[in-house]
Amino acid sequence: MLVLLSPAKDLAKETPSVKDTTQPVLLEQAMPLVAKLKTLSAKKLASLMDLSLKLGELNRERYAHWVTPFTAMNARPAVFTFNGEVYRGLEARTLSSEDLRFAQHHLRILSGLYGVLRPLDLMQDYRLMMSTPFGLDRRKNLYAYWGDRITEVLNEDLKTSGGSAVINLASSEYFKAVKPEKLTGRVITPIFKDKGPRGYSVVMVYAKQQRGAMARHIIQHRITEPERIKEYAGDGYRFAPDESSADEWVFLRDKRPPLVPRKLEGGRIR
């Protein structure tokens, strides 16, 4: 069984050191993308990625310093580097070494630049969302660039993990880079909904946190059979069979905590 997550825009400033790191499987395919990104100015990067000029300059510097081979001196493990809501739910820094070993076999992070990452794959800081209108040659976007490659890697990983299911905890933007019809495993997508004045609906900040929290639950409980996911009851959610379909499993929560404003890049408040 494999679990899929999206990456995050926010990256951690500091990460713990890890001995047994690995290299991204599709690193060679990332190199042509970086080569082209290196030619873009901060202004062009900001325009391409819909960023402030300050963040455009940050990413220009990132790509200018992007170099292989990846080592512990110039790169960091992916699971500790991403720092968005999903990864606040995952809390990778508090996972045990045994947890990380299980995650290395069963957790995959989809990426616009790296294609697909294992938790302990080294990566250098970047910003390149899968939906960015950026490609190479006649391939006009990243979906066309990656083509079947991501799906092929996932199929190999499914074979290695000995499972026949993919738990899709990634966003639709990233899962669009996977071709479900070519996957050798069944795809199950958990959906998290909170009760509001007009009934149950997806509250994105909570949904993202729960994607990470469910991934953590799967890792810590060594779950390899999809049916066991229905036992998940984190943060007040419960599986709702009447609201679910065969491949979309809905989890409902009746009472949600108040949203706390959080600072984003550039000091903005959400």
Question: For the regions a protein language model found, what residue spans apply to each?
Answer:
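Internal, well-folded beta-alpha domain core
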Residues: 92-260, 270
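Surface-exposed flexible segments
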Residues: 15-27, 178-187, 264-269
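Active-site helix-to-loop segments that bind/position phosphate- or nucleotide-bearing substrates
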Residues: 4-94
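RNA-interacting cores
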Residues: 46-47, 106, 264
